[in-house]
Amino acid sequence: DNGPSVQALLEQAAEKLTTQPTPVQGSGRTDAGVHATGQAAHLDVPIHLTATDVMRGLNALLETHQVSVVSAQPVAATFNARFDAVQRSYLYRILARPAPSALRRNAVWHHRAKLDATAMHEAAQTLIGRFDFSSFRAAGCQADSPIRTMDYLSVLQAGDEIHITARARSFLYHQIRNITGSLVQVGMGCLLYTSPSPRDFTE
């Protein structure tokens, strides 16, 4: 049991603040174990509540949880955080060393074996562009089309960590998680890439 979702916590707080059921729509899903920074969401509140009232009120109700609202502003009634998002970004932090980190335990993926970040980055560049990413979506993906455009994908060595950053307007369910797994296989020397096609990349 991973406990209530961030959306559920926000909706519970919003209902207390507005004294009525208040749905909260985020710009995208946040899977269990994922830390969301800069997540955008929208909700409808009574007109007498200012953006500052909403931010302060929600934070007061969320202070016992690991969720905080860092800013709020009024938007058009037609605004939708999910469908109006112009770009989404993922950052995977991999701690590539034998020993785990006590302080970063819940913020990084600990990988005991050394990884070749240069090879991983070169492989990542073949996935930039518009492709059929069927090979990288999870079985439960409900997207109508597997076609997505990867705007940016990089792999950088950052001290004892390897950072994988991906940016696109939208992603398939578990697309970046599965791409990260494949790039790690490249970094270990277990997987070679010879084609810019995502389908060939995993075969």
Question: What residue spans do the PLM features occupy?
Answer:
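Single conserved hydrophobic/aromatic residue that forms the stacking wall/gate
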Residues: 193-203
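Structured-RNA-binding interfaces characteristic of tRNA pseudouridine synthases
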Residues: 1-195
